[in-house]
Design a protein with these regions (language model features):
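Short beta-strand segments
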Residues: 7, 32-38, 108
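Short conserved active-site loop signatures built around small residues
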Residues: 13
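Short, high-confidence coil segments that cap the C-terminus of an alpha-helix
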Residues: 28-30
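Short, solvent-exposed loop/turn and secondary-structure capping segments
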Residues: 44-47
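Short beta-strand-to-turn element immediately C-terminal to the catalytic PLP-Schiff-base lysine
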Residues: 90-92
Length: 229
């Protein structure tokens, strides 16, 4: 069957779900195995990757981890690099049934976008447009209502303790408010980076999301004592 390598920086593992969806919809495959891994803290990559983040001003400046891993916190001052690996199996219902496997979740849709805006900053307006467009498409496709599903929705945040302007925190909060309006405060926002650091392309958030669906347990950060923007 087909195989490929996805390189969308720290969105690579998540983007692979979209490729899997396309392959299944096109009847190219019946099952896709996604394997993701990154070891940027290892001896081979550390000087290059850490040096790049430090040069761009994105690396944390505080050497006390508990005071640094602060997603959405007003005190955040940069990210901590992490490492890890994850694997996922995406297959047709018939294949899972044949194997006697109970699926954890169903993929209803995906989207991928690139604003070509900046290497280390986000186009805040474009992020909001993409999220709103995706939710609108899912509403039409599956007969959903964003306000009805908001109280039962968990948003897994990518926020990596970025700067107050032009970073993940500002982009994500604005995108959610533009998309869900008055229902935004009914959403649960989960973020794993207070525990894992930023493991680049690994997809720890995807694995944590699926584990949360299976166990009804969510890992939220303790570092929101002084919420910023």
């Amino acid at each position: 069957g087909p195989n490929t390598t996805i390189n969308l920086a720290c969105a690579s593992a998540t983007a692979a779900f979209g490729v899997a969806e396309d392959w299944l919809d096109a009847d190219r495959v019946d099952r896709v195995v996604i394997i993701s891994g990154d070891d940027v803290t290892g001896d081979d990559l550390w000087e290059w990757i850490a040096g790049g983040f430090a040069a761009s001003g994105a690396a944390a400046t505080n050497n006390v981890v508990e005071e640094t891993a602060l997603p959405f916190d007003r005190r955040r001052n940069g990210l901590i690099l992490g490492m890890g690996a994850a694997a996922f199996v995406i297959e047709r219902h018939s294949e899972a049934k044949q194997r006697g496997v109970q699926p954890i979740a169903e993929v209803l849709g995906s989207t991928t976008a690139n604003s070509a805006y900046h290497g280390t900053r986000l186009d805040v307006e474009h992020v909001g447009q993409v999220v709103n467009g995706f939710i609108t498409n899912m509403e039409r496709r599956w007969g959903l209502d964003r306000h009805a599903m908001a109280p039962n929705t968990v948003f897994f945040s990518h926020e990596t303790y970025t700067p107050a302007r032009g970073g993940s925190a500002q982009s994500e909060v604005k995108a959610l408010r533009d998309t869900f309006g008055d229902s935004t405060n009914k959403l649960v926002v989960a973020n794993t980076k207070g525990f894992t650091g930023h493991p680049m392309a690994v997809g720890i958030e995807d694995a944590s999301m699926l584990y949360g669906l299976k166990t009804c347990l969510l890992y939220t950060s303790d570092a929101a004592d002084d919420l910023g923007r």
